[in-house]
């Protein structure tokens, strides 16, 4: 029994004395074109790489579309898809083949956006919430400013490429 206690105490001491804290000797390897790590409380930048370089946000745009839609509608609302919403897409754009006049709940529309990357659902939700895609994009840009995303500018609700559609890590 004494041997067990001695072994337990020896292991505990070994664990306590064996612990060593250290800090990274080299910067992490980041393959992204731009990146930033900040301390949330102080705002101090701990790591940066091309933080003000404009990048194409692609489908990250859909996260902002969903956020603005959720804040300005109810999940139970019905979205009626216009011809413009479902046909105003570039060839090969991701879609779930919503038809003009088709009705989906806001909740189902958001699932289509976030899970299926449905570009026509982004357009339909934008029209439903703000009356037009352009009005909705203005709401997205306002929300970006409110969140401190000063290097971000949206030009559409779905993230398809446009030259004035960009974001930065900072």
What function would you assign to each model-found segment?
Residues 2-24:
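Sec-dependent N-terminal signal peptides of Gram-positive bacterial secreted proteins and lipoproteins
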Residues 23-166:
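Active-site-adjacent loops and short helices of periplasmic peptidoglycan-processing enzymes
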């Amino acid at each position: 029994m004494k041997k067990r206690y001695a072994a337990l105490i020896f292991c505990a001491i070994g664990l306590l004395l064996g612990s060593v804290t250290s800090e990274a000797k080299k910067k992490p390897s980041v393959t992204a074109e731009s990146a930033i790590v900040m301390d949330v409380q102080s705002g101090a930048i701990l790591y940066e790489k091309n933080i003000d370089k404009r990048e194409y946000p692609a489908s990250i745009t859909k996260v902002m579309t969903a956020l603005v839609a959720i804040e300005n509608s109810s999940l139970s609302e019905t979205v009626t898809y216009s011809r413009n919403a479902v046909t105003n897409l570039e060839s090969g754009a991701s879609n779930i083949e919503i038809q003009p006049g088709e009705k989906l709940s806001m909740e189902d529309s958001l699932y289509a956006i976030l899970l299926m990357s449905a570009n026509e659902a982004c357009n339909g939700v934008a029209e439903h919430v703000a009356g037009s895609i352009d009005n909705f994009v203005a709401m997205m840009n306002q929300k970006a400013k409110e969140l401190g995303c000063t290097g971000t500018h949206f030009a559409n609700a779905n993230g398809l490429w446009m030259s004035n559609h960009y974001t930065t890590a900072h």
